[in-house]
Amino acid sequence: MAASVPWACCAVLAAAAAAVYTQKHSPQEAPHVQYERLGTDVTLPCGTASWDAAVTWRVNGTDLAPDLLNGSQLILRSLELGHSGLYACFHRDSWHLRHQVLLHVGLPPREPVLSCRSNTYPKGFYCSWHLSAPTYIPNTFNVTVLHGSKMMVCEKDPALKNRCHIRYMHLFSTIKYKVSISVSNALGHNTTAITFDEFTIVKPDPPENVVARPVPSNPRRLEVTWQTPSTWPDPESFPLKFFLRYRPLILDQWQHVELSNGTAHTITDAYAGKEYIIQVAAKDNEIGTWSDWSVAAHATPWTEEPRHLTTEAQAPETTTSTTSSLAPPPTTKICDPGELSSGGGPSIPFLTSVPVTLVLAAAAATANNLLI
């Protein structure tokens, strides 16, 4: 009987050692996820530890000051976004992990902003939404679309997460559509809804490939061309009209032209030599609203190139001689000095080029002197 006592003690010690080993090497529990509102105070308990337990707190691996503790509890006041992180409390002596909290600081959602538009009429329309202020934590959106009392499918956009598409089931319907959206997160929820007629949300995309060119030999004209938006599915059955605006860069005031058809227009009142900016908008002929303005095109009206004229005064001098380098005109006769001094009369100053009429007048004067 006495020999059985040591065996009993060994069994107890082995069980205790196994319990300690299991506690130290067992997988750590996942941290508790907690959401708190920005600007509030929060108290984080150290799991099941008693209030007076000796513990140490860390956030993201950095020790926290002891004056933040109330017993074993961590007190965080006036929460800021920077308070978000992984908080852990440890037994002060053994550094055994007692508890972990993954804290997220954020805000409940405000009323979402919702809008719907048909840029592919008559195929369908899309709705998009966003929050007017960030929440800093994950949000979940839920959209419902009603056509009268009939629920319609809103297909998620593959590229834009805050957009979905609805196909028109009954074209030219007079029944209103109602679109509602709700948003929720860990701190709250909010909703909004809009009701509209089919034709009121028709708004094409802006015209594409707007090009402006000068018109040769016309200093006040610009030729503007553009294309119907590629997203407009049937321009033959549902034609668009266009609105063109233009101005010189030196002025702030726009000039406007509305065009019922066609994808070209010639501006006839441009300022010569001034650069212009031109934009075009589109709208269904009957319903809806105008598109946004297109990408701006720039152009300057045609200007005549300056002519480079060379005059005798502008021609560079190539000699210091007083003799002209230009050929004499057809009425000019080149005379010999000896011809003018023959007959004993007074000598006429030497000229390299004397008109025939002057020569005849001089000869007559000489003959008259001889007769006297």
UniProtKB/Swiss-Prot annotation:
Keyword Transmembrane applies: no
Protein family (similarity comment): Belongs to the type I cytokine receptor family. Type 3 subfamily.
Function: Binds to CNTF. The alpha subunit provides the receptor specificity.
Disulfide bonds: 46-89
BP-aspect Gene Ontology terms: brainstem development; ciliary neurotrophic factor-mediated signaling pathway; motor neuron apoptotic process; negative regulation of motor neuron apoptotic process; negative regulation of neuron apoptotic process; positive regulation of cell population proliferation; sex differentiation; skeletal muscle organ development
Organism: Rattus norvegicus
Phylogenetic classification of the source organism: Eukaryota, Metazoa, Chordata, Craniata, Vertebrata
GPI-anchor amidated serine lipid modification positions: 342
Keyword Disulfide bond: yes
InterPro entries according to UniProt: FN3_dom, FN3_sf, Hematopoietin_rcpt_L_F3_CS, Ig-like_dom, Ig-like_dom_sf, Ig-like_fold, Ig_sub, Ig_sub2
Region of interest (Disordered), ranges: 301-339
Protein name, entry field: Ciliary neurotrophic factor receptor subunit alpha
PROSITE patterns: FN3 (PS50853), HEMATOPO_REC_L_F3 (PS01354), IG_LIKE (PS50835)
Family matches, as SUPFAM superfamilies: Fibronectin type III, Immunoglobulin
CDD domains in the record: FN3 (cd00063)
Membrane topology of this protein: Lipid-anchor; GPI-anchor
